[in-house]
Amino acid sequence: MNDSAFARTRENISEFGNNAKAAKLLRDAMGALVKNAKDSRTSNRLMQLFNKVKNLDTVSPRGQRKISIALEDPVAKNFLQKFDFNKRAQLSNVLRRTFDLDPSAGTFGITAFVPAQDLLKPDGATHATVIYAALGLDFDTAESDLVQALPVNFALDNVPQELSLSLDLPDT
């Protein structure tokens, strides 16, 4: 493997290892929030995602590209924002209502929310919970800070309501 003919292979192995560490760091930092929500292919899909993100690091030489540098590109951040931990329960399919999300203010809200109409629910479900969280994650230092708003529980009925959740953003 030290032969110059294997230089590209060494670069690929290095970047694959870095992507695997980044994906594990994200999964571990999300902890219990995704433990029961993920699907059996989440790890594979995260690896694919981080491979795409890593390619957006145009500063570092091949073999040394970093997720942290790539995330300075808004396109890379958009990839992460659109990732669903469970492909069979994507937010856009489960929540059939537009919502307001302001990541810089730490707020999430839904106006005129009618749970029985606006949520795809399992048969027999009578109640649901909305959990809103924000994760600060430093891929270079492996430091993470997960903050969570108080969960909101509600009946799956036809009574319109306003959902408004806010949290203090993490430092990391």
PLM features per residue range, with description:
Residues 1-87:
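Long, polar/Ser/Thr-enriched low-complexity segments
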Residues 55-172:
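Charged linear interaction tracts used for macromolecular binding and regulation
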